[in-house]
């Protein structure tokens, strides 16, 4: 029996074959990994036209209705994580394409969030670059997190865990989202900001933890950044 053809897109880090176990489907599925991003739609369609299954890395390549209509062989579209706003699920379903996701954990994004915050506060990148280029040694002074205000846009599973770490550092943590209530904020032990603008104006650090969608797209732009202190 001819094998089904599966393509993995935008695997910049080469993790799909290194961290995932494909052994259970190796006899039925032939896997091709594309590590480089296809920025041109014509090139993308040409590359994917012969594949039955696609695996996408988050929102790196959107799949709107127009693109799905140009992939007649496609039967299954898998995204890392359970939600991907860049896939037109309704259009895929109408064409008989099954869309599904993989299980995800909250710990990795929380850890990455704090790695980025700490690197920024302590100027880790600048100091490392200076060290590697021959100096100057210790040319900047870091910023303490204790006593600073952390503003969270979004207080779901990830945001609430980020909040707990912030509290452990002795930070004043506030949160805001379109649907956040005082009761939900109190459950996590913090205060709900009166508005997005109020949060931005009073926070030393801001971290966004909202699902990408029409309501959250462009949430922070030039005018919002100008409000930050």
Regions found by a protein language model. Give the residues of each.
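Tryptophan-centric aromatic hotspots in well-structured domains and transmembrane helices
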Residues: 12, 34, 58, 103, ...
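Rossmann-like dinucleotide/phosphate-binding beta-alpha-beta segment
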Residues: 24, 139-229
């Amino acid at each position: 029996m001819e094998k089904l053809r599966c393509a993995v897109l935008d695997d910049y880090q080469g993790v799909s074959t290194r961290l995932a176990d494909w052994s259970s489907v190796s006899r039925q599925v032939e896997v091709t990994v594309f590590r480089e991003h296809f920025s041109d739609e014509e090139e993308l369609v040409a590359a994917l036209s012969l594949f039955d299954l696609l695996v996408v890395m988050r929102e790196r390549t959107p799949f709107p209705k127009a693109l799905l209509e140009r992939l007649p062989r496609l039967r299954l579209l898998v995204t890392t994580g359970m939600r991907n706003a860049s896939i037109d699920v309704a259009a895929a379903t109408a064409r008989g394409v099954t869309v599904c996701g993989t299980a995800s954990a909250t710990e990795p994004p929380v850890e990455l969030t704090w790695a980025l915050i700490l690197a920024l506060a302590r100027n880790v990148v600048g100091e490392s670059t200076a060290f590697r280029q021959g100096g100057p040694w210790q040319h900047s002074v870091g910023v303490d997190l204790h006593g600073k205000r952390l503003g969270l846009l979004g207080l779901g599973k990830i945001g609430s865990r980020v909040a707990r770490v912030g509290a452990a550092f002795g930070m004043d943590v506030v949160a805001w989202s379109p649907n956040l209530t005082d009761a939900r904020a109190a459950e996590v032990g913090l205060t709900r900001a009166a508005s997005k603008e109020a949060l931005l104006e009073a926070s030393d650090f801001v971290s966004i933890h909202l699902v990408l969608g029409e309501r959250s797209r462009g949430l922070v732009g030039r005018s919002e950044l100008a409000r930050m202190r």
